Amino acid sequence: MACRRRYLSSLETGSSLSTDRYSVEGEAPSSETGTSLDSPSAYHQGPLVPGSSLSPDHYEHTSVGAYGLYAGPGPQQRTRRPRLQHSTSVLRKQAEEEAIKRSRSLSESYELSSDLQDKQVEMLERKYGGRLVTRHAARTIQTAFRQYQMNKNFERLRSSMSENRMSRRIVLSNMRMQFSFEGPEKVHSSYFEGKQVSVTNDGSQLGALVPSECGDLSDPALKSPAPSSDFADAITELEDAFSRQVKSLAESIDDALNCRSLHSEEVPASDTARARDTEPKPGLHGMDHRKLDEMTASYSDVTLYIDEEELSPPLPLSQAGDRPSSTESDLRLRSGGAAQDYWALAHKEDKADTDTSCRSTPSLERPEPRLRVEHLPLLTIEPPSDSSVELSDRSDRSSLKRQSAYERSLGGQQGSPKHGPHGGPPKGLPREEPELRPRPPRPLESHLAINGSANRQSKSESDYSDGDNDSINSTSNSNDTINCSSESSSRDSLREQTLSKQTYHKETRNSWDSPAFSNDVIRKRHYRIGLNLFNKKPEKGIQYLIERGFVPDTPVGVAHFLLQRKGLSRQMIGEFLGNRQKQFNRDVLDCVVDEMDFSAMELDEALRKFQAHIRVQGEAQKVERLIEAFSQRYCVCNPGVVRQFRNPDTIFILAFAIILLNTDMYSPNVKPERKMKLEDFVKNLRGVDDGEDIPRETLIGIYERIRKRELKTNEDHVSQVQKVEKLIVGKKPIGSLHHGLGCVLSLPHRRLVCYCRLFEVPDPNKPQKLGLHQREIFLFNDLLVVTKIFQKKKNSVTYSFRQSFSLYGMQVLLFENQYYPNGIRLTSAVPGADIKVLINFNAPNPQDRKKFTDDLRESVAEVQEMEKHRIESELEKQKGVVRPSMSQCSSLKKESGNGTLSRACLDDSYASGEGLKRSALSSSLRDLSEAGKRGRRSSAGSLESNVEFQPFQPSQPPVLCS
């Protein structure tokens, strides 16, 4: 009997592998097997794959094993029963996890429409106990998890202090100096040679090559000596190398200082070579050695870049842009007004025929804390945003080639003033003027001046908002209005008392629409769509803007766009810059921090300035990436502060600790008695400076400043929406599509367009008393919210929610009769569906009706265009999956911008897209709800739609919109 049991037990072990895949799905077992989920053969199984078949041998093993199991004694079954229940729960859990993974993969491959996304969130909220409970639980869990991850990362960083931080790109005192100058000779094909000298902590990597900006590798100026174990020897070698570079450069600098006339036709090319071999003047040599001593006093590597160009006269702006000048790029990166100064300089050179390069030096008179040599034409010395190794990698990735393209596009745009504002720095050039006149520098936060014809006309018709933060000033969609935004905080409020007096209140939005495109409604709409896409998915939005020519395809151009343009969610800016997976995002972050000057600032105050532009919040890895770049830039700007610590990485650890302190001190989820005290803050930073403590006075100062003033991000367009959301009280029913506001009004992509007072008309054929059914209308870029004044106080007004309508599929109609002379009718106009009247309004006067309907129609067109773009993208993806081997598309290349199929292939797919099922594009709740009512209809998402997917072909070269 015992032998038989051992034999059956061995058969059970063999049958477990065969019955595994069959029994996990819960299907009815075969009559031959007699197994089920409760059998012990299903217990020892891992993740299972459905759909597998069983061989005859497997059936035999299974039946015998099952027979042997149930033929056994009763006590054996009772002892195994708890284990079987545990096995069932484990298998069920694994099946649920697999289902979640499949749903995630599907969600990544197909983008749902906005109404389906809202419905998805609504279903999750219903599943987990309702909106309030779900939101509170999700917020608590997310906050706790992020705090846990931040603390975990902080402890990891503390424990890794002894490791080499070069892999983390904290090159704390790394100085990159770029010397460029222009001279009197005229050359038609200029090139730049980049020569780099780098000394790391181990004394290696001396003389690493840096590709030139034209993409070609230049000859090495210095050979790499053998690595030395003594760091002092490496510094000595650096001094020698630096001296040789300074000697070779000194004569060229001296020639530039001689202020030779532009009338000289040419200078032999050997002059430059002779200048490199001659000895420099003692004054210049001594000065550069003093700079060298200051640089080599810190610990990290020092990198020298010398961009040498044959001396050439200033070319006209249309020709100068063809030369990929690193000097132009560097000057454009200067914070404050240096970029504008450069454009003013270029204009002077274009106008003056006899000016020498020495007279161009006022463009560099702006004081900079970085290393600089006075009175040199176009001389820039720029600290790095990256290590020398990574810079070489970026050059190999042709980011410098993109920079050259950016320079060429700038040059072409400068040549035509009407396109100029969008390629160069937007703050220094007047709009649509026949000549380019320099203007005085303005701060980074200042906004563009506008041509006021359309603005004055619209302003005479309606009252503008006093608020001028990012959201309230950036959103009007009218065709005749271009409004300007500012970051002044003195007029941020919504001015509720003003709203209650005005019948129409338009939100300004100058930075959303470029004055150069004031007559191009479609172009401005595309720009706003790009901003909306960025505020939903940053990478997708940047790609959209680059493809349409609004943003240069360079890290420098994208960095300028993120810092200078309004209408971008600061939260999404942080999401984009904190992406560690994409090298382009990392390059943009380097350029962004290079725009900021943290000289002579305390660490917490510099961090406050950094966080004012970029919201440092989210996943711990992204926060670490942002703080890493900030710390690098801070140490470059403050080499004296770095020398106060034993290890430069202490700056990074301290900055990370400040973020933790600010989060802990101002988080509403942390109880007051559990908030971080001063002693806790000091204790957390004990021994982080290579075993030494940071001076207690420094930590006390940081703690007190954070306690008195929170690290906050500047307001953006979302801030204004949040203020409106706080003013709306009462029950907000959760209804999809047209019946409710939903759980959250303030979203990163939502902005306020206008505020208007209208009167609701229940029945257009019946009269009503004057002033009855007064409604306060808030028009957002994707939503129309109808409210009623709930309570009016002296300094505030609250509104009760009535209805909300999605703008997708909305149609705006006008009507007039003897009772309502200024009637407005809103209907649902999905192609092929029944027209449904949503609501009727009567405006107080014809002017308000015109302005409101213009804004509403433009907002509806914007939403429709975004949905069309989404469906186009899905069509291309579906076409690539269903018809990957289309013969007519085999010879067509993919677009370089995003890798999508060419437009000709896409247009062909519309005519012969029978392989695509209609259900694949029915991603709207309208499609789902109307499917049962009508047997066959056309929708915006189907191939039978009458919507024409014709690409927009601009009649002018793509330029950067303001």
Curated annotation (Swiss-Prot):
Residues 134-163 form the IQ domain. Residues 1-96, 264-292, 311-333, 348-516, 921-962 are annotated as: Disordered. GO terms for biological process: actin cytoskeleton organization; dendritic spine development; positive regulation of focal adhesion disassembly; positive regulation of keratinocyte migration; positive regulation of synapse assembly; postsynaptic modulation of chemical synaptic transmission; regulation of ARF protein signal transduction; regulation of postsynaptic neurotransmitter receptor internalization. GO terms for cellular component: glutamatergic synapse; nucleus; postsynaptic density, intracellular component; Schaffer collateral - CA1 synapse; synaptic vesicle. The keyword Cytoplasm applies. The modification Phosphoserine is found at S89, S105, S107, S180, S248, S252, S511, S514, S891, S923, S924. CDD domains: PH_IQSEC, Sec7. It is found in: Cytoplasm; Nucleus; Postsynaptic density; Cytoplasmic vesicle, Secretory vesicle, Synaptic vesicle. The PH domain mediates interaction with lipid membranes that contain phosphatidylinositol-4,5-bisphosphate, but does not bind membranes that lack phosphatidylinositol-4,5-bisphosphate. This is IQ motif and SEC7 domain-containing protein 1.
